[in-house]
């Protein structure tokens, strides 16, 4: 019986559970999900990729990544998944009728983020704001890091905490700027 106690305690505590620790995800029905590990395989541009989460947070992607510190009105997901692999954060919005207040709030998260001193002289930080109409209809805002997705029905300041606590967590901690893709609305000032 004595040898069973640690196992029972482990089971009671969710010992083999890979869920995230309890955290206040703000309002807006926010939820954070850990996405099962998938290989970050490089695929030819234009290849159809099926990801295990929506929006995608890990897995196959194009060999090129998008230029950092930009707001993209449109960007193929396979580019921004590569940005995640490099330790970046992608802030997404889905507003078919437009949502300038939400977009401005996401841009403020990027503008007020600390300068990445490891990337000094290359980029301010490794963040993007991207419109993503492929997200589920009930998701207006998402924040994505390699292997982690926060989704919500509206903007909540929790987005900034998600970005701050998961920044530079990708398997390739690289500062190199990506390619300035078409669809970029603005570049963030240094």
Regions found by a protein language model. Name each.
Residues 1-7:
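Sec-dependent signal peptide recognition
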Residues 6, 20-22, 167-169:
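Residue-level signal for mature regions of secreted extracellular proteins and peptides
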Residues 10-12:
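C-terminal motif of bacterial Sec signal peptides marking the signal peptidase cleavage site
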Residues 14-16:
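Bacterial signal peptide processing site
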Residues 20-81, 103:
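Surface-exposed, low-hydrophobicity interaction/linker segments
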Residues 46, 79, 86, 124, ...:
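Sequence-level motif detector for i,i+2 pairs with an aromatic at +2
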Residues 73-120:
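Mid-length scaffold segments of soluble, non-membrane domains
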Residues 112-190:
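Helix-rich interaction surfaces within compact, conserved domain-sized segments
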